[in-house]
Amino acid sequence: MSKRVVIFDTTLRDGEQSPGVSLNLHEKLEIAQQLARLGVDVIEAGFPIASPGDFEAVKAVAEQVRGPVICALARANRKDIERAAEALRGAEEARIHTFIATSPIHMQHKLRMEPDKVLDTAVDAVKLAKSFTSNVEFSAEDAFRSDVGFLCRIFSAAIEAGATTINIPDTVGYATPQEFGAFIKAIINGTPNIDKAIVSVHCHNDLGLAVANTLAALENGALQVEGTINGIGERAGNASLEEVIMALYTRKPFYNLETSINKSEIYRTSRLVSNLTGMLVQPNKAIVGKNAFAHESGIHQDGVLKERTTYEIMNPEMIGIFTNNIVLGKHSGRHAFRERLKELGYSLDDEKLTKAFARFKALADRKREITDEDLVVLVEDELRAFPEAYSLEYLHITSGTVLVPTATVRLRREEENFEEASCGDGPVDAAYKAIEKITGTGARLASYAISATTAGEDSQGEVSVKLEREGRFYTGRGVDTDIIVASAKAYLNAVNKIVFDGLPKAKTERAV
């Protein structure tokens, strides 16, 4: 009989530590709800002591998301643990994840503590966490560079104090698979009461080995995997959960392990995380990359057409990438639209369906054939609609080789229209300067990226931007068949998030 692997998602905590990523409460909740649909076992929602915003995010996820265990991170001290417990009060099932560093370099230079003091601190932390919840995880930070004998001692003491999960991180991504597998086995063999806890691993990707190390750990007795969607995280990121999950599924005869993941939600979850964080998925990324199921070689194409398994070890439909020969157009009705969305896995209420159908009709007037990719982009845009302080009413651009690029923009806020014109270094820059004149955010454009979401000369373009305002980053996304319009929508989407955060007030002297 196969053993079940616990999937612990830390996209909202470790993943959000990616440089330039800053999710607001609304976005964190959206990701958490999708992770619940994906079927992860544990959601690490944040680090409550880190900031009031982190506390509120963990609290909201704990109160509103049902299904997975909701986890909060805490250092091994009273203040952190009590704050985590407070944030988790509304959870259906809560877990406190407390940690302390155990490697000689960390104990000496960061903690300035002797090993015995570190052990005592860990035990006290676990006991305190246990007074708030029966579900307690203890992590030894920088475990792979720690002494195995000391790890066995501290893990044994933590389990005795009440820890139900023991986590073994490769914090700096230094391990190799053969080493890490042997390391896990040595800890399991050297910790007498290890059978009273689940052994977990948390691998970083500094050498590109996070997934390989995770799988090696599972081969050697670990039964919880910690990672993130798309492998995002600080530095080179974390183990990519979708890769671990599909490796276990595809190679089940080898690993004899299974998960409770709803695999058909993998692709949708990946897209959501990518869009909200602004971190684009590389085209050749395993499982969810744009080219993951693409075949350009004639020999490969011929083989796949004759028998898919000649060059594909999994079906794209398995992870939620659906293909269909039925093409919708401007003459397609509401019923056909709804039915196709259902086939793609989307169930919209009447209000959202009405809005999405109106957008579909508008797109069909500009685009001869509407593909599944178009529908996915359209419906996800509607499902993720962010509260709009400003909406784009009008955009006019003049540009060319002998013209000064100029943009005229009209935005609507509540019942008032605001219009401005500006010149710039190209049409996009001109549009952004005009929007900035109206909104007055004072934000800096930190990044700008374009990708084609669908194929063909009338394809939709997707623009992703990041605005930086007082050290915080705001991601915006816009989609349109006109890339300049998509660019304006993306910038405005990020501006609305700044306004949603309460800064700054809009200028009103230009009402028209």
Curated annotation (Swiss-Prot):
Mn(2+) binds at residues 14, 202, 204, 238. GO terms for biological process: L-leucine biosynthetic process. Keywords: Amino-acid biosynthesis, Branched-chain amino acid biosynthesis, Cytoplasm, Leucine biosynthesis, Manganese, Metal-binding, Transferase. It catalyses: 3-methyl-2-oxobutanoate + acetyl-CoA + H2O = (2S)-2-isopropylmalate + CoA + H(+). Pfam families: HCS_D2, HMGL-like, LeuA_dimer. The keyword Acyltransferase does not apply. Its cofactor is Mn(2+). SUPFAM superfamilies: 2-isopropylmalate synthase LeuA, allosteric (dimerisation) domain, Aldolase. One of its GO terms (molecular function) is acetyl-CoA C-acetyltransferase activity. Coiled coil: none annotated. It comes from the Bacteria. Catalyzes the condensation of the acetyl group of acetyl-CoA with 3-methyl-2-oxobutanoate (2-ketoisovalerate) to form 3-carboxy-3-hydroxy-4-methylpentanoate (2-isopropylmalate). NCBIfam families: leuA_bact, PRK00915.1-2, PRK00915.1-3, PRK00915.1-4, PRK00915.1-5. Belongs to the alpha-IPM synthase/homocitrate synthase family. LeuA type 1 subfamily. Homodimer. This is 2-isopropylmalate synthase. It comes from Heliobacterium modesticaldum (strain ATCC 51547 / Ice1).
